[in-house]
């Protein structure tokens, strides 16, 4: 469908209440043509024709619902979509400009003559794998000192001294706590993090969540994990959401099983 052409003289001579003809919108395939009339700074009537290419993409339900809100203020008579005269789409970007002196002061700690590598065997300015003393008595002595240090750390539990959490129980460290985590499965491919947050935030506060996605397409794999702050909220999520209908699918919610 091609945009309908009208006589400019007819449009100018037409009698309108506000002095301006109404806006027109014509859709031609994947393109949308919008014709608007306004007065310029000199008080002359001008005609503005804008063409848009219509693209379809999947957005979260919160964004789709927000687009159906009734416009107000200066945009109450605008058509769907943002108006550049009343709407600012971009985010504010704060920039901090620094002078040449500040830039030099920020890079004073970078010494070009300082070696980037340090050998753990002889403390030289080279990597340990390229040390000329590798395999000699000096190398064996450094390994013995490292083993003695590790043994001393292991004995701190008996002496009552503080041990960092990452050194407790050997190299195993602390295991992940899944006592308040639930697994939500049978999710649709269009599920997003915003939709998942909208689904669980009414039950109770949560510390983190994970939505499994395909690496290539970025679509949801069909399951997600939510770690609640309190176990009672996790139990309520299992009771309320299990068997709950969401996006034309029946959700399956269960306790997260600990990793072996």
Curated annotation (Swiss-Prot):
Main location group: cytoplasm
A Gene Ontology molecular function term for this protein is: RNA binding
Question: What is the source species?
Answer: Drosophila grimshawi
What does the sequence similarity comment in the record state about its family?
Belongs to the eIF-3 subunit G family.
The protein depicted here goes by the name Eukaryotic translation initiation factor 3 subunit G-2
Would you indicate the residue range of the signal peptide? none
Q: How does it assemble?
A: Component of the eukaryotic translation initiation factor 3 (eIF-3) complex. The eIF-3 complex interacts with pix.
Gene3D superfamilies from the UniProt entry:
3.30.70.330
Where does the protein end up? Cytoplasm
Q: Known PROSITE patterns for this protein?
A: RRM (PS50102)
Write the gene name.
eIF3g2
State the UniProt keywords alphabetically: Cytoplasm, Initiation factor, Protein biosynthesis, RNA-binding
């Amino acid at each position: 469908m091609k945009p309908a052409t009208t006589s400019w003289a007819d449009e100018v001579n037409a009698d309108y209440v506000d002095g301006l003809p109404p806006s027109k919108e014509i859709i031609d395939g994947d393109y949308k043509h919008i014709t608007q009339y306004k007065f310029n700074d000199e008080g002359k009537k001008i005609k503005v024709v804008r063409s848009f290419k219509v693209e379809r993409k999947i957005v979260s339900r919160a964004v789709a619902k927000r687009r159906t809100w009734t416009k107000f203020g200066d945009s109450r008579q605008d058509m769907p979509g943002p108006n550049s005269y009343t709407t600012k789409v971009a985010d504010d970007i704060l920039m901090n400009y620094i002078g040449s002196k500040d830039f030099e002061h920020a890079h004073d700690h970078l010494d070009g003559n300082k070696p980037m590598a340090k050998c753990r065997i002889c403390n030289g300015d080279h990597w340990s794998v390229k040390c000329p003393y590798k395999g000699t008595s000096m190398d064996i002595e450094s390994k013995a000192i490292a083993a003695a240090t590790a043994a001393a750390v292991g004995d701190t539990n008996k002496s009552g001294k503080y041990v960092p959490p990452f050194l407790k129980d050997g190299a195993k460290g602390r295991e992940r706590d899944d006592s308040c985590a639930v697994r939500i499965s049978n999710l649709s491919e269009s599920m997003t993090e915003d939709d998942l947050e909208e689904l669980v935030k009414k039950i109770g506060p949560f510390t983190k969540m994970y939505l499994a996605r395909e690496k290539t397409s970025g679509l949801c794999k069909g399951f997600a994990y939510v770690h609640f702050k309190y176990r009672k909220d996790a139990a309520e999520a299992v009771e309320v959401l299990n068997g709950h209908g969401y996006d034309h699918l029946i959700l399956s919610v269960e306790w997260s099983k600990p990793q072996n």
